Amino acid sequence: MNRILTLFILFISLFIVCEATHFRFGTMSWMPMGSHNTIKFSSNYAFRIGFFKKFNKGCNVGDVVKVGDLDLGDDKTKVDVNLVVTSVNQADDWFTGEFSYTHTYNPIKLGGKAVTYKVVFTDCCRIKSLLNNAEGSWYISTSVVVDPNQGSDVSTFNRSPVSGMVPIITLNRDKNNQFLIAASDPNGDTLTYSLSNAYTMNQPSGLSIDSSKGIVSFKPTVSGFYSTQIMIKDTKGAYVVVDFLINSVIEPGVCHPSCSNGGNTCNGNSGCKSCKGTDSNGNTCSSFPPVFVYPPTPTDGSLLAYEVNKTNSFSIQCKTEEKSKTVFIQPANIPLAATLTSSDQNKQVSTLTYSMLPQLKHIGVYVISAYCTDNKGLVSTITSFSISVEKPICGHGTNKPGGGCNCETGWDPEKNCYECLKGHYGEKCDPVDPCVNGESNEGSQGNGKCTCYYGWEGKNCDIKVNQVCNANKENVVLDSSVAKSSYINPNFAQVYLNTDPSKQALTLSSKLSIPETIDKFEVLVLVDSQPSIVEYWDNFKKYSSDLTKNLQDISETVSIGLGLFSDAKTNGYSFVLKKSIGNGLSGLDDKDKAPASSYSTKNSLIALTSAAEFPAGWSTGSIKIIVLLTDNDYSATAQEVSKFTSTLISKSILPVVVSFNDNQNWDTLFKNQGFGSTKKTSNAKGNDWVSVATSAIKDVLSKAVVKAIDDTKGFLTLPSATTISIEDSKDYTIPIQIKYPQGQSDIPQNPSVSYSVVGFGITRIVINYNSAPTALGYSIETKQNVNYNFKLSGSDVDGNTLTIKFKTIPAASVGVIQADGVTIEQGDSFSIEKTFTFKPATNYYTKSTNDKFTFVANDGCLDSNEATVEIKITHVNQAPSCSSLSGSAISVTGLNTPKSFSLQGSDIETDSNLKIVFGDLTAISAYGNIKSGSNVVSTGSSVQLSSGSASLTFTQTKDIANDKEITVDFKVNDGSLDSSSSCSFKVKFVHFNKPPVAFAVTPLTIRQNSELKITISASDSDSDSVIFTLDDLKLGGGDSFFKCDDRSQLTAPFTTQPVSISGGVASFSEICYSSPLVNANSYASLVFFANDGQLSSDKFKVLININGDRPNAPPVVNQIPNFTMNEDDISNELVIDGIDPDELDQGKLKGIIIQKPTNGVILVKSGSSTSEAPIIGNAPYKIFYKPNPLYYGTDSFSYTVEDSMGERDATPKTTQITVQHVNHAPTLSIDPYDFTSQTSEKTLELTPKDIDLIDTVFHCTIVKLPATAIIKTSAGKVIDTVPTDLSDNKYIITSNNNIYNDFSDSFDAKCYDSSNAVSNIATGPITFRYINVPPKAESSDETLNQDSSVSFSVKATDLEDNSNVRAVIRSLPAKGTLTIKSTGKAAEISSTYAIDDFVYTPVAGYSNWDKPGHVGPADSFNFVAKDSKNDISSNIGTVSFFIEPRNPPTYEGLAVLYTKENTDLPFSISGIVGNGGSNVFLRIKSIVSRGSLYATHCMGTEGCMSEPNPVDININFTSQPYTFSFTPIEYENGDNYAIIEFVLYDKFNGQEVESQKYTIIINVIPVNQAPEVILIEHTLSTLPNNVIAFDKFKTVKMETNSYVIIKYDGTDIDDPKEKLKSYIVSPPLRGLLYVYDKDAKDGLGKLIKKDDTFVPVAQDGFWYIVFVPTPGSSGDGYVRIPISMVDFLGDISVPVTVAVDVSKKNIPPFITIENKNYTSLANTSIVVTGVSFDDPDSKYNDVELILSLVNKDGDLVSNKIATFSLSQQSKAKCTKHSEFAQFTCRSNKKTLNALISTMYVNHQGGGSYRLKVFVNDLGYSSPASIRDKNHMTATDYVELDVTKPEVTTTKENNNKTVLTGAIAGAAAGAGLLAAGAWFLLKKSAPPTDAFFGEGAFADGAVSTNPMYEESGRSAINPLYEASSENL
C-alpha cells in the first residue's frame, strides 16, 4: 500500500511538471581566451520539452533550440542563447542543453583599473506548481572581471568557479536531507557557498548550506516542488550560481531499531515513537533507495583531469540491494564531447560508459551530475564529479625545447598557438582575404569577413560605392533592420524615392511572422464597474478565470491586465487601471463595484481611448488587445472617434468590445475603420460572455490590418487586410507601396512615416530623396614656376558621389589646369576624387589681383552652386637659362689657328652677374684649348657674360688621327642658381693630312756598260698608297732609263700606278738604267716625287755614278738583338750597320728600314729632341724605338744595308720587340652637383679615367665630408666617417632636413684602379637651393558625443617652421558651429587661426544617427594650412566629425493620470529607446504626495514585489515597462494629488545620458464613500456590570434564557454622522430583536420586524439594539444580526454582522460506587459491582470512560501482574492498553454503565490497590467553539486489598499453586466493605487533585476546576456537531 502511495505521488508530481511552465535548471561559468578581455562563457540549462513546438515530434541529443537572450553586461551586447541538447528525460519532460559564446570586451590598457561586468540570463517563467517563486522569472548570473594586470600568461588568469547539478533533486518530506553542491575552481581557489539573494528568488524556508563545504541541509514539510539557487564564489570575487528544483516526496521507510515501533513502515520521522537513535542523516524513518557504486563511478565531488587530443573514459554505475528491483541512471550535463559507448540500464546494477576525446575547443571544466531511480520509485542521492580539460602549453602546436611553441600554420607562437596570427581567422586560422578599405574579422573567433569602411563595398572592400543620383533610378530600399522580438519586420527601413512621378512605386515587403510559440501576447480587460444589472459584475468576477484560461490556450505566457470605467451619470469616470499588464484578473474587490446604474453616459469609446493611452505596462514587440466589457453602446463626437482610431493605430492595439446590450455604433465604427471586433453576449447571467470575448479576440487575430501613422503627405499606399492564422507558424508578406507624393509642398528633408499592422507592431520608414549638392570654394597658393596639385570639394546630404565641372578656367597667360597630364578645357567634367595640377605659365606670378576660375558639383541629377577658386602665385628667384650652340661643330682650318665663337645666357631677373660655368674640359685639353681672351678655360671655371654673351676662341694645337667632335657642357649661373639644365656646344678636332716623303738611295754607283735596277720609295703614315712621278730624267749620253719588265724606254714625266704602302713605306722598283763605257760621277740622274692623292712629297733626286768595271759583293746587315722594354719608355740606341767585303764600300754603307714597326715608331735624336727616323741613313744608322702610347705587347721592324753600288743584303734582318705593360694611375674629376629642396634624390657616380685600356674597374673612397650637405651610399646609408669606400662608386647628395636655406659645399674623393694605383684627390662642388615647401594639411576625424562640444587641433605641419603654422578656414560645418576657443567667436571663412584653437558644437540632437545607415561622419569643414611666411598654402584638409548618438530615451505616455478615491492606481512608465541607444533606464527624481508610490515587479500568478518610495531607483526596462502602484491616503482626493518627477536615461560606454525631466500628475477622483458600521460593545443580562468590547470575530456568547444589549456607531467620510440612518438588513429568524429603550422594562423598546427594520439613533449619538433568544434554546451560530447604514445619497454600507452563540451551562458528570472496598487473595478474581455514573445533560452523545488499576501512589499497574475484564465489551468502543491494566472506552452513558456493571479484577501479588474510574463528558453540552475547553469530568476509586494466601501446596499437573477457599472468601468480603465506604465518601464530596495527587491525571491536562480532569483528546467528533438542545 505504501509503495502504491509513493508511485501515485510521483505520478502526480510528474503530471504537475509536465503541465507547468518551462525553466528547470541553469548555471553559467566563464574563462579568459587568449587575452584578458576575451571571455568564453559556458552554460548548462534545463527546460520543459513540451514548451517548444519544435520538439513536438521528439527531442534528441544534438538538437538546437533558442531559449532566450544572454546579456553580456556591456550596455548593448545581447546574444541568442541557442542550446545544444545534451540529455533528454522523456519521463519527466525535461532536457538539458549546453551553450557557449566567446565575447571580447573593450580592452583596458596595462595598469588600468579592472572592470567588472555582470552577465545575466533571465526571462520568465519558472514552473507554476512551485511552492516558492511560482511562475517567477529565472535569473542566472555571473560576475566577470576584466583585468589587464594579470600578466601575459593566460593560463594563470582567473577563471570562474564551475558548477552543475541535475535539474530536479528528489528529497524526502519530513526527513532530514543533505546533498553536496557540485562545484570546482579551475584555479584551485577555495570556494564559499551561500544561498543566492538574486532578484525574484525566495529561498525555501528551512534550507541552509555549509558555507565552506557546500553541503545543503533541508527538511521539507510539504510535498511538492521548491526552487533554490546557490551562489559559489572564489577568493577573487568571481561568482557563479546554480539554480535547480527540489522535489519533496513522501517516501516510505522503516523506523529505526531504537524506536518503540522499530521496524515498522513509516512515511516520516513523526511515525516513529520513543526513538533513542537515528540514521546518519538524523532520521528515525529511513528508506533504502538505490546507491551509486564507487568506483567505477568517480567519487562524489572528485575532479578528473583530461588532456587535449587524448581519449578518456568514465562510467556511472548504480545498484539496488534488492534483487527484485532494477535501477535506471539519469545523467545531466554530459559534455557534447563525450560519447555514450555503452548503456546497460534497467538492471539490478546499471552502468553507463562514456568516451571523451576533448579538442582545444573543449577546454574548460564540466560538472556532471546523475541520480538513479529504482522501478518502485525510490530515488538515489545525487552524485557529481568534474572533468577538467586542461589547456596544453601550446594549443595548436608543439613545445619547443627550452621554451616557446612551434605552431601550426596560421597560429601565433607569442600567444602559445591559441590565437591566430594577424591576417588569419577561424578555428583553423586560415588566411583572411585582402581587405583593402576595411577591417577583417580576424582571430580564432573571427569569420574572416571584411567589414568595409563607409563608402566601400565588395568582398574585399575594394569597390567604391558610387551612389550617384540617377534621374532614371528606381525607388529602392537603402537600409532596414529586423528585431528578433518583433512580429512585424522590418521594424525600420530607409528608402530612396525618385521624385519623378513616372517611376513605379517602391514595394516594401513587410513580414508578419507567427512563431511556433506565441510568447509575447498582452491583453487589457476593461470592465464597466457600474453596470445597469449587478449580475454583469458578478459574472465577470466569477468567470474571469475562464477568460484567462482561454487566453492561455492562445499563448501560454499571455500577460493580462485589468482596467475599470464607469458610465454612470453620478461618479462616472473614463478609466482607472486596476491591474497592470502581467498581473492578471484575480483579486477584484466588491469595493470596486459601484451601485447599479440604469442611466449611462455611453462613454465606453472614451474609456477605451483612455485605456489605450494609459501606461498600463505594455511591452515592446507584443501583440496588444484591449477587451471592453460594457452594457451600453457608445456615443461620441467625430473628434473623439478620430482620436480613438488614431490612438489605437499609433499604439498598435486591437480593440474588442463585448456588449451585454446594444452595440450598433461599435459595429459600424469597426467596419468603417477596418479593424476591431464587437459581439453581443446572449446570456448576461452566465459565462457566455467568455466564449463571446474569446471568439472576438480570435476574430481580430485572424487578419492583419495596416494603417498609416504620420503620413500627412501621402507617401504610403497600404494593402487591404490579410487573412492570417496565429495557430500556424508562418510568415505573411504584407506589401507596402511607397512613392514620392506629387503636388505637395514643404516636404522636409528626410521625412519619416510609419505604418501599424494594428495589434502586431509598427514599422518606421525614413525617406530619402535627392537634394542639390554644395560646392566648396578653394584657394590655390603656389610659387612662380611651381606646379600645384589639388582636389576640389563638395558635399551632398544624400551621400551621392559627386562630379565637378569647370565653368571657367584660368587665362593661358596665368597657367593651365591639367588632369593626368592633359590640359582641361572649359566645360570638362571629372570625378570629385580627381587630383588636378595647376601649372603656372612660365615665370608668371601674381602682381596684384588674384586670378580665378569657377566650378560646380553635380550629383548626377542636379548642379550645385558655382564655387570660386582663387589663384595666387608668389614670385621666386628663377634659375637663369642658357642656350646651346646649334649647327655644325666649331672647327679650325689648321693647327694653332684660333677659331672665335660666343655663348649666350639669360635671366628673367636681368641679373648682371651671369657667368658661364664649364663642365669637364679634359677631352679638349689633350688636343687644344678654349680661351676667354688670353686665358685658357679649365674644368669648372667660369666666364662672365656681357649682355648675355661671352666671346671665346677655340684652338687645335695637336693633330688627330681622325676627325673627332667633342661636346662641351656648360651652365649659366646668376650668382645663386645654376640654370635648370645644362647647355652644350661642339668642337671638331680635324686631322690634317701629311704629304708623303720621297726617298731613295743616292748616289748610286754602276759599272760601265752595265744595268742598274733603281728603287724609289716614299713613306706616308696616313695614306694607303702613293703614285710616283718621274719628273726629270737626265742622261749623260749613251745611257738610257727603261722599264725593267718590258725594257720600254722611259721618258719624263712618267707616272706609276698607285703603289700600296706597307709598313708605312711604298717602293717602286721597275726603273732600270743602262750605263755606257764611261767613267764619271753624277753622269746621270732622275728626279721623282710621290703623291698620296691630296698632297705631293718634295722632289727627290737620285744621282748615278759610273765607275770602272769592278766586281761588287753585296753587303751583309748586322742583326740587332731582340729586346724588351717598358710601355712608356724609349729604347736604348739601336744601330743599323753591316759588313761589306768590298773595300771600296766599307764605311759607305747605308742603313735602310725595310719595314717600320706596327705599334711604335723609329726615332732619331738630334740633341735632346727626337724625331721620326728617315728610311735611309748612313751606317752605322743610330735609331731608337718608342711604342705607340699605351701600347704593350710585341712589335718588330725589318732593315738592311746597301752599298755604294746599290747592292743590298738580300736577306733583311728583323728585330722582335717585347713592350711590357706599365700601370698608370687613374685620374678623377667630379662634376658639380646643383640641387634644390624639391629635387628627388639622385644617385650620382664617380667616373675616374685611366689611360690604361685594360683598367675598367675602379673603387672610390670619400676622403672628406661636406660640411652641411649629407652624403650617402647608393643604399641610402649616411656616410659620417672618412675614409669610406663606395662599394659601387655611387653616392647620393641630400640636404639635412633641418636646413631651410641655400648653401654651397663640397666633398673630396679619390679612386683606385685594379692595381691599387690611386688617382688624384678630386673635389666635388655642391650647390643647394632651398625652395619653400608648402605646409601640409592632413584630414582628421574627431569623435564626440551628441549635444556636446569637442576642442581639437587641425592637423597641419610646416617643414620649415612647424610651430607657427596656421589654419585658414575654407568652408564651415553644415550641422554645427565652429568656434575659436581663445576668443569665443565663430570662425569665418578665409580667416586665419592657430591650429589648436578650435571648438566644434553640433546642432542640438544631431548625430551620426541622422546620416544614411547611421554612419558618420555627420559633419565636416575644410581648411588649408599657411606657413610662417604666409606666402604659400597647403592642400585642403578636412576635419570630419563623428558624432556618437547620445539620444536619451523619450517618454510618450500620459502626463496626467486619474484614479478613484480609495483605489490603488497601477501604472507603468515606458520609454522609447533614443536614436542610437539600446536601453531605457528610469530614475525617479522626486515624489510629492501624501499617498504612497510603490515600484512593483509582477511575475504572473506569483504576484508582485513592491518597493516603497522608489526615489533614485534605477530601473532597466528596455524590453518590459516598469510598473508602479500609487495608493492615495484613504478617503482623500483632489487634483495634483501626486506629482512624480522622473528622467529616462541610457548608458553609452558606461556614461549616463539623461532625458529631460518628465512629470506625471495623478488626480484622485472624489467618490462618494459608503458609510461604515462600527461595533462598539455589548452587555449580557447575566453580567449587567461587565461591558464586553467586540473582538475581531464580532461574536456575542450568551447563555440561554438571557438577553444582550448591543451598542454600535456609524461613520461616513463624506458626510456628518447626523445624516446617517441605520437599519437591520434582515431580522433574526430565532429570538426577538428590539430597539433599546432605557426607559422600557428590560430596555426592550420597539420590536424590529421585516417591515420595520429602522433603528433610531439614541440621544448619545449611538445606536442600541437588544436581542432575546427563544427561551430554553441554545446553539453555536444561533443567529446572525446584519446591521447597515445608509447615507443621504443612498449609498449603503457594507453590512456588519453580529454572530450570537447561545449556550447551556454544562453540568458535570458524577460517579456512584455502592461498595468502595474489596479484599481478596492474590490470583483470585475480585468481582466489582455497583459502579455507575451519570451526566445529567447528556443523552445520546459519547462520553469517555477510563478504568485503570493503580497503586497507592497512583501509578498504573502493569498488566503482567494484574488484569481485569469488563462485561459487554462488544457494545462499546474500548481500547486496552498494551502494557498496563487500563481500558479506555467511548460510547453513550447507557452503554458504558452496562459495561461496568460487573468488573473482574485479578492480581497475582499482594498489596493495596485502587480501581480508578474516570468519566469525561467531552464538553458536548457546550457550544462547539468552546467545547474542547469546557470538558467536565468526575473521578472515583474502588479500594482493593489483596493478600498472599498461606499456601498449602498441592501438586497439580499444571504446577499451579491454588489458594484455599477461605482466603478467597475473606478477600471477597473485604472488597464489599471497601465498596460501601467509598460510596459514602463520594456522596459527601467529589475527590480532588489534592486527594489523589498528580498521578491520577497523568494521561491528560487538568482544567481550571480541580474537580475536572480534561481529556487528552482535543479533536471534535464530527458525528456530534449539534446544538445542546438535542442532547
Curated annotation (Swiss-Prot):
Disulfide bond residue pairs: 435-450, 452-461
Highest taxon of the lineage: Eukaryota
Start and end residues of each VWFA domain: 522-709
Location within or outside the cell: Membrane
Residue spans crossing the bilayer: 1861-1881
Membrane topology field: Single-pass type I membrane protein
Topological domain spans for side Extracellular: 21-1860
Keyword vocabulary terms for this entry: Cell adhesion, Disulfide bond, EGF-like domain, Glycoprotein, Membrane, Signal, Transmembrane, Transmembrane helix
InterPro entries: Cadherin-like_sf, EGF-like_dom, Furin_repeat, Ig-like_fold, Ig_SibA-E, Ig_SibA-E_2nd, Ig_SibA-E_3rd, MEGF/SIB
GO terms of molecular function: calcium ion binding
All copies of domain EGF-like, residue ranges: 425-462
Main location: membrane
Cytoplasmic-side positions: 1882-1927
Annotated Gene Ontology cellular component terms: cell surface; early endosome; plasma membrane; recycling endosome
GO BP term, example: cell-substrate adhesion
Sugar-bearing residue positions: 309, 1122, 1516, 1717, 1723, 1855
Claim: Glycoprotein is one of the keywords in the record: yes
Pfam short name (any one): SIBA-E_N
Cleaved signal peptide residues: 1-20
Family, as annotated: Belongs to the SIB family.
Chain's role: Implicated in cellular adhesion to substrate or phagocytic particles.
Summary of subunit composition and partner proteins: Interacts with talA/talin.
Protein name, entry field: Integrin beta-like protein A
